[in-house]
């Protein structure tokens, strides 16, 4: 009966691991031109991956986009009056920190209140900006607005 195979006895099959060919190391093993053929750009240097063989490249075929991105543009986070009513059914004083605490907007960004939906509770809202319809609806419900 033979011994069980042990992990340290395992060897790869003969010819399974061929040594890597080191090119340019003598005439017998891809010496001189090292498998690149003779002459031409590809024999002398590597062509960039973006080169399309003289065809007009993709980045030049595509049209230029007009305009620019305004770095000074302010992106407001919006919250509607209906969302405020759902989040604060008891009414009262509401600041941006309270709106953030309820998870309606993210912190550290300006907040604009829009007039989508209906409102019936008295809210005294402080935010960065308000739409005209939001101001009308909040004041019609007996509340007030303050731009901070």
Swiss-Prot record:
GO terms for molecular function: rRNA binding; structural constituent of ribosome. One of its GO terms (biological process) is translation. It comes from the Bacteria. This is Large ribosomal subunit protein uL15. Residues 1-52 are annotated as: Disordered. GO terms for cellular component: cytosolic large ribosomal subunit. Gene3D superfamilies: 3.100.10.10. Binds to the 23S rRNA. InterPro entries: Ribosomal_uL15 (IPR030878), Ribosomal_uL15/eL18 (IPR021131), Ribosomal_uL15/eL18_sf (IPR036227), Ribosomal_uL15_bac-type (IPR005749), Ribosomal_uL15_CS (IPR001196). Part of the 50S ribosomal subunit. Keywords: Ribonucleoprotein, Ribosomal protein, RNA-binding, rRNA-binding. It comes from Corynebacterium diphtheriae (strain ATCC 700971 / NCTC 13129 / Biotype gravis). Pfam families: Ribosomal_L27A. The keyword Magnesium does not apply. Residues 1-12 have a biased composition (Basic and acidic residues). The lineage of its organism: Bacteria, Bacillati, Actinomycetota, Actinomycetes, Mycobacteriales. Belongs to the universal ribosomal protein uL15 family.
């Amino acid at each position: 009966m033979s011994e069980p195979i042990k992990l340290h006895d395992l060897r790869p099959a003969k010819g399974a691991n061929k040594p890597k060919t080191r090119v340019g190391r003598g005439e017998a093993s891809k010496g001189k031109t090292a498998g690149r053929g003779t002459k031409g750009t590809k024999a002398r240097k590597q062509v960039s991956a973006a080169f399309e063989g003289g065809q007009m490249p993709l980045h030049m075929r595509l049209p230029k986009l007009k305009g620019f991105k305004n770095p000074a543009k302010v992106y407001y986070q919006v919250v509607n009056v209906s969302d405020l009513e759902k989040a604060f059914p008891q009414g009262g004083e509401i600041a941006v920190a309270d709106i953030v605490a309820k998870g309606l907007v993210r912190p550290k960004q300006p907040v604009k209140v829009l007039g989508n939906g209906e409102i019936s509770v008295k809210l005294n809202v402080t935010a960065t900006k308000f739409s005209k319809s939001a101001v009308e609806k909040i004041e019609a419900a007996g509340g007030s607005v303050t731009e901070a």
